[in-house]
């Protein structure tokens, strides 16, 4: 079992998108991460909330995860980049944290 049965790692979200990337590509982690970010930006533009839920790498390295991929007909050397939950927020977003001073430098 990948998760404890008493925990919902996806916070009750109605939709979960799993991003996998082909490990034969030298930039697969960057490519998959960019896919995640672009989906999150597109969702926000449509008024849909999103959250990147980690552990996809570990999930699909497990025997249970490999069995899921096989059942779906996904063959090859893929690595889980992330799980992306999508839905409508239960309430308004809180205020953003203050920016860190001297965190970004202009050169």
Kindly give the residue locations of the regions a language model identified.
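Acidic, surface-exposed loops and disordered segments
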Residues: 1-107
